Amino acid sequence: HRIATTAALSSDARTLTLVGGGDPTLSETALRTMAGKAAEALREDDKDSVRLTYDTSRYTGPVLHPISPNENIAPVTALMVNEGRLDDTDRGVADRSEDPAGDAARTFAAQLEKAGVKVTGEPREARADDKARTVATHRSAPLSALVERTLTNSDNDIAEALARQTAIAKGEKASFAGARRAVTNELKKLRIPVADAHFADGSGLDRKGRVTPALLTALLARAADP
């Protein structure tokens, strides 16, 4: 499975919507490629200008982690570029954007302009039209690679994203609460003891989170012999 970020063009080809799928590793390079494909679609419709909106509805509930603002984690939103980092790092602490979704949309707008498309007005948040067609897609690295990066770098942003992807896959809302329910239920199915444990978030940064020695031992044993 890979997390998809898409660009959807309205039926009248007047509005382009950047739709976040929950990929915190989305890069400016990926947005450049998407902008090029979107520009091609607009030219096929004889359009050289477009309104730009951005859709973060994949996630619900609070955006700010309980410890936010904090250099260890960005606002948890379905759309961001490079984990909302304000520098060129890809791991460790860093100053974070207060509006990663809006920043991603503005970056996409700049790439559209470079591709020859005039973006009218400022990008605004709105859901994609139900009749809009997808004109560009970027897919993340496989989930296995995201898990490896999370564990190697202790990456809080990807950890939160993975928790929400679990929630989505299990029919829960992609929120802190939905992720908690999904993760807890999946551990129960694996017969991992969850008594006295509390998964307050996906990253473990919330001080209300608790795990027990029994849970950790059972989880490590299961991982060693799946």
Task: Give names to the regions the model predicted.
Residues 1-103, 114-148, 152-156:
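Active-site-adjacent loops and short helices of periplasmic peptidoglycan-processing enzymes
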Residues 81-226:
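A small/polar active-site loop signature that marks catalytic segments
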